[in-house]
Every structure is written in structure tokens, then in C-alpha cells.
Amino acid sequence: MSNVKHSKLLILGSGPAGYTAAVYAARANLKPVLVTGMQQGGQLTTTTEVENWPGDAEGLTGPALMERMKEHAERFDTEIVFDHINSVDLSSRPFRLTGDSQEYTCDALIISTGASAKYLGLESEEAFKGRGVSACATCDGFFYRNQKVAVVGGGNTAVEEALYLSNIASEVHLVHRRDSFRSEKILIDRLMDKVANGNIVLHTHRTLDEVLGDEMGVTGVRLKDTQSDMTENLDVMGVFIAIGHQPNSQIFEGQLEMKNGYIVVKSGLEGNATQTSIEGVFAAGDVMDHNYRQAITSAGTGCMAALDAERYLDSQGK
């Protein structure tokens, strides 16, 4: 692997953050190189419909939106490389990265590798992803208006998803393997109010044993009692797995400051909101954001990262 590709700006990741960063960087004549990663288009490629993207009132599919973003980046001469980075060295300049196909060096780096939703690992769960199984209520909840859904999990994410869906679905079944929830008190209070006076039903000491369905999609779930091992079937049209996300930041461990796997960035008070603990390295999208995790917020931070990188490169005379 003697071939080394150098660029002023290298962007890792091909989701909304990466492609937006590419558009802004290319328009600034930084001649960015974007390395797609293994999941081209990011998490949105697993979303069937996107109906909250401003300007697209009719809605569009996740893959279609990402293809449009890719074309937009290419229009301004972003070089897109289909490769996966498996190691990095940020200890010297230029930064050095090693991919499956070749090595890369760059004067500035934007990390937009995203985060991956955690799943339970059931074969049936995998089989119905995008056809009734989701990990994002704000993305896909709309499609279950006035229908019964299940949420699996016991932390803040699960409770928030259940509360959100309770305003859309006819009935929300919250499934948790324990009898108490690992969530903030204010969320627990809201949850219990919805249980007592609303449309949320708790299934504690239960685990998801199987997702049930047919060629049309999910039709129900099979739950297992953690104390008796007895099983029961529940009729639902959607299943939301809410057991957290894993930021795709493993290759940067020990080199960048992180918190729970998410890359830490600056406050932005000095116009450097996306700068990491290493000058010249910036982060955007879900790899640094564990709160919002929306396509539009990822795109926004991608824009910010490109502007921050442009200022940095200018300050270095690059």
C-alpha cells in the first residue's frame, strides 16, 4: 500500500454531515476528498421515508435524499472515494490515515462517521428493519399514527421515544427487562402519568424474544418473562428499539478527547464549535452529538465544520 493520497481537507463519512461539509468546503475551493466509509449514505439509507426535511413537503426516501446530497457534493468537484478507514495517526502533520484500499494524508480532517443504533441481535429484528423495526421514533413514528407500537428499552432514550410516540400511536407498549427505569425523574413522572391517564402500557420483567410479521411487515412481538420464562404475543405494527447508540469513533480512541465514545468539540465562542482536542481536526454529526441525532442537525454541524476547517487552513497558509 505505497500509494498515498494527499488532500488539503479530508472528510470521513457520507451521511448528511459529511456531504454538507463537502459542499461548503468545495465551494471554498478546498478541493475536499470524502471517504464514504462502509455504510454509504449513513443511517438515512435505512429510513424508508423522510418527511421532516425542510423544503421537501411531499417527503422522500432516505436513500433518495442521500443520493441528492452526493450529487450536490460532486457538482462542486468533491472527490468521493469508496473506502473504509481502519487506522489513523493524528500525532504529526500532515495527519495520516490508512484505509482498506490506500493511505491518505491531509492538512485538516473532518470526522463525520456518525453513530450506529444498538440492536438486540435477533434474526427477526434484522429481517424487519425498515419494515416495522426502527431505532428512531422521530424519524419513523409518523407512519404509525393511530396504530399500536412497542418500544424496547429502559433508559432515557426508551422513555423519550415512548412519550413521543404516545402522541402519535393509539397505544404504546414499553418493554423493559427490569421493573425500574434508568431514566431522569422528570421523564419517569411524565411516563407514569401517561401510564395512569394515557395510552402507554408497561411490560416490565419482559424481553423481546421475537419480532413477528409477514411479507407486508411487522404484525407483532413475542415477549418473554424474565422471571418465569413464559412467553406472550402482542399485536403491534411497529417496534422501536431504544437501547442507545454507539458512536463510530473507535479508531480515534486514545488520540481525541471523548465522552462516552462521543468526540468532544469546543464551545464555539471563538468560531470553532466543531474543533476537537487536536487543532485542525473537526467533528460533525452524530459522532459528536448524542442529543439531537437528526439529519438536519447533522447537516448543520457539517456546514460548521467546513467553515471551521476553512478558517483553520487559511490561518496555516494552506
From Swiss-Prot:
Cross-referenced NCBIfam families: TRX_reduct
Catalytic activity, EC: 1.8.1.9
Primary site of residence: cytoplasm
Gene Ontology molecular function: any one: thioredoxin-disulfide reductase (NADPH) activity
Cellular compartments annotated: Cytoplasm
SUPFAM superfamilies per record: FAD/NAD(P)-binding domain (SSF51905)
Cofactor(s) needed: FAD
Gene name of this polypeptide: trxB
Note: The active site is a redox-active disulfide bond.
Protein name: Thioredoxin reductase
GO CC terms of this entry: cytoplasm
Keywords: Cytoplasm, Disulfide bond, FAD, Flavoprotein, NADP, Oxidoreductase, Redox-active center
Binding site for FAD: 36-43, 286-295
Disulfide bond positions: 136-139
Assembly and binders: Homodimer.
Catalytic activity from the UniProt record: [thioredoxin]-dithiol + NADP(+) = [thioredoxin]-disulfide + NADPH + H(+)
One biological process term in Gene Ontology: removal of superoxide radicals
Keyword Flavoprotein applies: yes
Gene3D superfamilies linked: FAD/NAD(P)-binding domain
Family recorded in the similarity comment: Belongs to the class-II pyridine nucleotide-disulfide oxidoreductase family.
Binding note for cofactor: Binds 1 FAD per subunit.
